[in-house]
A protein has these predicted regions:
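Bacterial N-terminal signal peptides that target proteins for export
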Residues: 1-9
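C-terminal motif of bacterial Sec signal peptides marking the signal peptidase cleavage site
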Residues: 16-19
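Sequence contexts marking disulfide-bonded cysteines in secreted/extracellular proteins
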Residues: 21, 43-45, 152-154
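Beta-sheet ligand-binding and adhesion/scaffold domains
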Residues: 49, 64-66, 93-154
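Short, surface-exposed coil-to-beta transition loops
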Residues: 51-55, 77-82, 103-108
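N-terminal glycine/threonine-rich, aromatic-flanked beta-hairpin/loop signature
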Residues: 59-86
Length: 154
């Protein structure tokens, strides 16, 4: 009879252990799901002087960006278009698709993110597959004369 009681107590103990372990595994899975959810942020930057404006707003999710970019430079045509690309560390590399003088164009743009600024990169370009792209991204010069400052999105 005492052996039977030990048997029941052991069985109940094993059931409790199994139930506790199952609950722990479920908690771990939920934590992983919450941590692996894609994080999305929207950022806005602008450079404004008396006669010039450069502005962008984009959403960053899992290293990919989508948004808009606008150039309104004195005595030049206004360009407004879409931006799609990726963040590589502190560097944003994207295609800027825009309309200028009634012509749809696509060109590569590269911005360096430094503190709360986006600084545009400039360098030699060439046409590839109907798009203007940089010949050598490693040779780009980043012009800090027109830094876009981070601002609150409207």
């Amino acid at each position: 009879m005492q052996n039977l009681r030990h048997f029941y107590i052991s069985g109940i103990f094993l059931l409790c252990l199994t139930a506790c372990d199952t609950k722990q595994n479920q908690t771990d899975t939920k934590t992983e799901d919450a941590n692996s959810a894609p994080v999305s942020t929207t950022e806005c930057y602008s450079y404004v002087t008396d006669k010039d404006t450069i502005a962008t707003q984009f959403t960053l999710a899992n290293g990919n960006i989508t948004g808009a970019l606008q150039y309104k430079l004195f005595e030049k045509d206004k360009n407004t278009g879409s931006l799609t690309g990726q963040m590589h560390g502190d560097t944003l590399v994207a295609e800027y698709s825009f309309m200028s003088e009634g012509v749809q164009s696509v060109r590569e743009v590269v911005f360096l993110k430094k503190d709360d600024n986006l600084i545009e990169g400039f360098g030699d370009i060439e046409e590839k597959d109907g798009k203007m792209v940089f010949k050598d991204k490693a040779a780009l010069k980043f012009d800090s004369n027109t830094p876009m400052k981070k601002m609150e999105c409207k």
